[in-house]
Regions:
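A compositional/biophysical signature of low hydrophobicity enriched in polar/charged and small residues
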Residues: 1-152
């Protein structure tokens, strides 16, 4: 068994409570988590450090309403390419790509965010340089539920 599997098996209720509080609000400090859970603050701190060390917690970030900063066009792009390595490098460097997922059926699911539809279609034209076998894209009309798993 891998190290992360063993760590998961050792997860106790304290760790689960800490994770749920951080998923709900990553800016919550250890004292607040301690007060709300009844877990001693030193235990919260120690467990947090272990969760980071074992890469259970990998990053803290903020949710942004992209429309309020001028990015009005969001699209999910499904792509299958003969040039996977080059395509992935291009996507990794592209400033308008929020996330890339490796998926079945297609190679990648791309979460693309652009100021305008025109700029998005320029991006689609650029993708065709990577020997695309299959491409499908869908407009995001409304983001209804955002990062709610494991945060009760």
């Amino acid at each position: 068994m891998g190290g992360s599997i063993l760590f998961f098996m050792k997860m106790n209720n304290n760790n689960i409570l800490i994770l749920k509080h951080l998923r709900n609000n990553a800016r919550k400090n250890f004292s607040e988590i301690s007060r709300e859970t009844g877990i001693p603050v030193t235990t919260v701190f120690d467990n947090y450090q272990k969760l980071r060390k074992n890469k259970v917690i990998t990053k803290h970030s903020s949710f942004i309403d992209f429309r309020k900063i001028g990015f009005f066009y969001r699209n999910f792009v499904f792509v299958k390419s003969r040039n996977k390595k080059e395509l992935l490098s291009y996507l990794d460097d592209h400033k308008n790509i929020n996330s890339v997922f490796r998926i079945s059926t297609y190679d990648y699911l791309i979460d693309a965010i652009f100021p305008t539809m025109k700029e998005f279609y320029i991006f689609l034209d650029e993708l065709r340089n990577f020997n695309i076998q299959k491409l499908e894209h869908h407009d995001v009309v409304e983001h209804i539920k955002k990062e709610e798993f494991f945060n009760e």
